């Protein structure tokens, strides 16, 4: 019988390089078991086919997972023109094949232009979006007729990295909720030949623009070699780089951690990251126009060293 895994409090962010073929939740659970972390969450799903950056939040860092979910992201996509599939990627069943027209660089740029900016995008029917409390992919697998939702998304840039028919390589910088599978599908229709994603890699997620990612294999090897789990994680404050920073003295930091409101005309308005005098993050707060700081999310136990 395998020994029972004893989980412990562990706080921080792991920049996982997710492998292809694994769901985001399965990747999270694999990392959580290796780290023996009590609590964990990911910051937005990557398709099973996709690889690349999947920030995983553990312990108190799960309180900022939702903030990272809404961050800007960048992807490298390999697109195959001329074939559509039911999932809009290479994991799906082919639906239709069409001839790929002769395309110049100018043709590609003209076709891509309408997909840059604030656009309306219909999600793939094989997606984790919920309808009636159930993921769309579950309904699709049962053969139900589905009308996937259309949502406004923000695509900041699309760069052509290379084209050799039928393969097209793109780099896409976009906001939260953008489906690169949908972009490939819709681009294929504009070109008149259909398309699907052959491979997809997420390069970065704000604020981790130059991430030092780690694979599950490297994580396992490091832990087997005796590396302390907490040294493999980024501290919570690494995920707070985009917020205005307030540093409180010991007395006011204690009051903030007790949920009390504070007031100072010098506080910057809006959502802020609050730190104690030793640099330990106390939590997130919201400052109103009158300089009143209200606690939103409080971090606890960050100075505790997890048991081995």
Curated annotation (Swiss-Prot):
Biological process according to GO: mRNA pseudouridine synthesis; tRNA pseudouridine synthesis
Q: What class of enzyme is it?
A: isomerase
Does tRNA processing count among this protein's keywords? yes
Q: Does the keyword Aminoacyl-tRNA synthetase apply?
A: no
Instruction: Drop me one GO molecular function for this one.
Output: tRNA pseudouridine(55) synthase activity
Function, as annotated, reads: Responsible for synthesis of pseudouridine from uracil-55 in the psi GC loop of transfer RNAs.
Q: What is this protein called?
A: tRNA pseudouridine synthase B
Gene that specifies this protein: truB
């Amino acid at each position: 019988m395998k020994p029972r895994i004893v989980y412990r409090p562990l706080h921080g962010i792991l920049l996982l390089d997710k492998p292809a073929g694994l769901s985001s939740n399965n990747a999270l659970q694999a990392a959580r078991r290796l780290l023996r972390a009590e609590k964990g969450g990911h910051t937005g799903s990557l398709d099973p086919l996709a690889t690349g950056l999947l920030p995983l939040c553990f312990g108190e860092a799960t309180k900022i997972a939702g903030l990272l979910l809404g961050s800007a992201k960048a992807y490298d996509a390999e697109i195959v023109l001329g074939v559509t599939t039911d999932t809009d990627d290479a994991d799906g069943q082919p639906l239709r094949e069409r001839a790929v027209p002769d395309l110049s660089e100018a043709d590609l740029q003209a076709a891509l232009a309408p997909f840059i900016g604030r656009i309306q995008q219909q999600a793939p029917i094989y997606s984790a979006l919920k309808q009636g409390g159930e993921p769309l992919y579950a309904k699709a697998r049962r053969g139900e007729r589905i009308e996937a939702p259309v949502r406004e998304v923000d695509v900041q840039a699309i760069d052509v990295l290379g084209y050799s028919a039928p393969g097209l390589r793109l780099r896409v910088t976009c906001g939260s909720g953008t489906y690169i599978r949908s972009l490939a599908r819709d681009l294929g229709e504009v070109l008149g030949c259909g398309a699907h994603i052959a491979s997809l890699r997420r390069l970065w997620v704000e604020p981790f623009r130059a991430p030092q990612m780690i694979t599950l294999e490297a994580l396992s090897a490091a832990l087997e070699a005796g590396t302390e789990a907490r040294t493999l994680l980024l501290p919570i404050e690494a995920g707070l780089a985009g917020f205005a920073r307030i540093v409180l003295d010991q007395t006011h930091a204690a009051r903030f951690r007790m949920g009390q409101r504070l007031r100072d005309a010098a506080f910057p308005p809006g959502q802020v990251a609050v730190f104690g005098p030793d640099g330990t993050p106390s939590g997130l707060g919201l400052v109103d126009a009158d300089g009143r700081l209200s606690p939103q999310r409080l971090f606890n136990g960050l100075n505790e060293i997890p048991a081995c």
